[in-house]
């Protein structure tokens, strides 16, 4: 993004950096802080909020960043930022009331907490860049509406699969081609992985076992592809997606899909297990223009009717700075939902569930997530994966059955349920 680094260098020369507030101090937040503070001119992390400030302190110390102040006092915090320091705080109101912070980055992966703090950020006039695909898939349309009502900006960031895919989708569409598949390349899939099975892997990478389980059991890819569908208006071919398996290169797999069916559907989101390049993303697109067809063949993309475009990786927090600059300086959100949902993620029993069982969170022992088309979700009264945590099962549910709202009692008084009621009416 050549135009972005030029804009950031100009900000640096004018001593007018974009001031970022970071929510959370996990692995992704750590990477973002490292990237912005060490390698991004024209941008600084002015504040980090974490419910336990000591964890944020450990992040700064591990990165060799020493110019910070730990405080919950708003006056001291504002002065520290004015003096060029970063602030670490465990008080959310102090964090949200900081004068100079203009954009907040939310990367917790939590639904209820994430929704609460994003809405509070909007109310305090802060723009929000989210790295929370789980929340955006579940409540993205209503969050975007709330942002517009508060005259602030909201978007998902680049670096994770939804943002990388949307960049590719726009690139392909900008050349006049018609995208018919937005796809994700997964290394493996096992719906029945749990925090117990993923404990060793999680520890080796410094992540929570639930996060590792979310990746392995298919829930994460479901949320990611739902975000893309909701930003493009695409659908899924069936509940759970087609999820073909192959060890071939993505360029050689267009034959797996029925072209006429793709055209009839108007485009789908998908994933392929085991293909190359992993962990990349791809767009299969078509064109009816004879001149384009001629030179796509000349460019070694084949004779169609499906042409393969791909990005061989997703670079996580390395792309965070460009995401922020695009949102703030260019009013160019990486990926935002359309006016309503098109694909949702529904809670599916990972094991037999019995009356009295309380459903644990995403990446837990009880459920995994599957994509389904929004109209089907609404007509069958299916339980959203993003709203399933804390629900109490009231009747037996067999393994691999999708839960409905008739199968559970929902906790009372949750903001996320009220937001869903609003979103359904959009």
List PLM regions with ranges.
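C-terminal catalytic/substrate-binding lobe primarily of soluble NAD(P)-dependent oxidoreductases
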Residues: 2-11, 201, 205-426
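Short, ordered loop/turn segments at secondary-structure junctions
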Residues: 25, 51, 93, 109-110, ...
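Short gly/pro/ser/thr-enriched loop/turn and capping motifs at secondary-structure boundaries
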Residues: 55, 135-144, 161-165, 186-190, ...
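Short glycine/serine/threonine-rich phosphate/pyrophosphate-binding segments
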Residues: 28-32, 107-116, 131, 137-141, ...
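N-terminal glycine-/serine-/threonine-rich beta1-alpha1-beta2 phosphate-ribose binding loop
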Residues: 1-120
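Rossmann-fold NAD(P)-binding glycine/threonine-rich loop
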Residues: 112-124, 132-152, 158-159
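Rossmann-like NAD(P)H-binding beta-loop-alpha module
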Residues: 147-151, 155-220
């Amino acid at each position: 993004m050549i135009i972005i680094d030029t804009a950031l260098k100009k900000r640096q020369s004018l001593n007018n950096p974009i001031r970022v507030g970071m929510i959370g101090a996990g692995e992704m937040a750590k990477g973002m802080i490292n990237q912005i503070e060490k390698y991004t001119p024209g941008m600084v992390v002015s504040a980090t909020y974490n419910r336990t400030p000591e964890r944020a302190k450990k992040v700064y110390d591990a990165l060799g960043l020493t110019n910070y102040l730990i405080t919950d006092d708003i006056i001291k915090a504002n002065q520290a930022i004015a003096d060029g320091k970063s602030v670490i705080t465990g008080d959310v109101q102090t964090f949200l009331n900081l004068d100079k912070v203009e954009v907040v980055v939310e990367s917790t992966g939590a639904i209820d907490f994430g929704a609460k703090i994003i809405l509070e950020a909007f109310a305090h006039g802060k723009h929000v860049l989210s790295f929370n695909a789980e929340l955006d898939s579940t409540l993205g349309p209503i969050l975007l509406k709330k942002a517009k009502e508060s005259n602030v900006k909201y978007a998902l960031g680049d670096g994770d699969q939804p943002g990388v895919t949307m960049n590719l989708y726009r690139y392909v569409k900008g050349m006049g081609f018609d995208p018919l598949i937005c796809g994700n390349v997964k290394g493996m899939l096992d719906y029945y992985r749990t925090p117990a099975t993923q404990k060793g892997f999680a520890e080796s990478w410094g992540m929570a076992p639930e996060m590792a389980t979310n990746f392995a059991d298919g829930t994460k890819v479901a949320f990611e592809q739902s975000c893309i569908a909701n930003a493009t208006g695409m659908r899924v071919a069936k509940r759970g997606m087609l999820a073909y398996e192959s060890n071939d290169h993505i360029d050689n797999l267009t034959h797996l899909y029925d072209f006429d069916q793709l055209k009839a559907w108007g485009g789908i989101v998908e994933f392929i297990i085991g293909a190359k390049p992993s962990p990349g993303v791809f767009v299969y697109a078509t064109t009816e223009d004879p001149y384009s067809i001629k030179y796509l063949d000349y460019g070694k993309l084949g004779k169609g009717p499906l042409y393969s475009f791909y990005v061989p990786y997703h670079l996580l927090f390395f792309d965070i700075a460009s995401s922020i600059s695009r949102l703030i300086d260019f009013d160019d959100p990486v990926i935002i939902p359309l006016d309503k949902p098109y694909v949702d993620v529904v809670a599916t029993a990972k094991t037999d569930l019995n009356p009295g069982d309380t459903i644990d969170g995403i990446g837990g022992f009880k459920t995994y997530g599957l994509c389904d088309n929004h109209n089907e979700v609404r007509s069958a009264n299916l339980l959203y994966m993003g709203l399933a945590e804390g629900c109490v099962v009231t009747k037996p549910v067999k393994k691999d059955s999708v839960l409905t709202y008739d199968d559970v009692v929902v906790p009372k008084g949750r903001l996320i349920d009220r937001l869903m009621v609003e979103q359904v009416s959009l």
